């Protein structure tokens, strides 16, 4: 690894340890030329699968779209940003763990609904009403009844 101070190629690792619950390696390095020390972090780069939309189009996974949809459902609900971030990271890990290069947007929608069901029941109903395109109050009521029987 190149030294960020003098750009020398020859550096050595002084110390290594796992961080971020074992998902990263923190390395303390020293330059053999200028003797400066610096820290690097190493992690596996796992790409998100592409999405196959309902009309057949393919597009890259978009974190912003995911967060906008989730935040809209959770608007004015008592859920902390930390809980939202943890749930989104879990959802993204689940998608990466499929090992697939492409997944349908339907799978992502179902995962978001499960995520919201665990965070806030009202947010779940809000999201489900848009995602499932309820046609009338009866469908809305059926989803609420299903939610009540689950708990």
Swiss-Prot record:
Repressor keyword on record: yes
A biological process from GO: negative regulation of DNA-templated transcription
Entry's cofactor comment: Binds 1 zinc ion.
GO molecular function: ATP binding; DNA binding; zinc ion binding
Keyword annotations from UniProtKB, A to Z: ATP-binding, DNA-binding, Metal-binding, Nucleotide-binding, Repressor, Transcription, Transcription regulation, Zinc, Zinc-finger
Cofactor requirements of the protein: Zn(2+)
InterPro entries to which the protein is assigned, alphabetical: ATP-cone_dom, NrdR-like_N, RNR_NrdR-like
Keyword Manganese: no
Zinc finger (unnamed): 3-34
Residue span(s) of domain ATP-cone: 49-139
Function: Negatively regulates transcription of bacterial ribonucleotide reductase nrd genes and operons by binding to NrdR-boxes.
Assigned protein family: Belongs to the NrdR family.
Protein name per its UniProtKB record: Transcriptional repressor NrdR
Source organism per UniProt: Psychromonas ingrahamii (strain DSM 17664 / CCUG 51855 / 37)
């Amino acid at each position: 690894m190149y030294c960020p101070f003098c750009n020398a190629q020859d550096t050595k690792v002084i110390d290594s340890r796992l961080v971020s619950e074992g998902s990263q390696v923190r390395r303390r390095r020293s330059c053999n030329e200028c003797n400066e020390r610096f820290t690097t972090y190493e992690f596996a780069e796992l790409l998100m699968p592409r999405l196959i939309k309902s009309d057949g189009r393919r597009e890259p996974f978009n974190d912003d779209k995911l967060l906008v949809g989730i935040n809209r459902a959770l608007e004015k609900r008592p859920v902390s940003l930390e809980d939202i971030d943890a749930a989104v990271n879990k959802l993204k890990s689940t998608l990466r763990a499929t090992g697939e290069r492409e997944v349908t947007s339907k799978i992502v929608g179902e995962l978001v609904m499960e995520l919201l069901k665990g965070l806030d029941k009202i947010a779940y109903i809000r999201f489900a009403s848009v995602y499932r395109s309820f046609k009338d109050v009866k469908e809305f009521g059926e989803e609420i009844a299903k939610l009540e029987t689950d708990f």
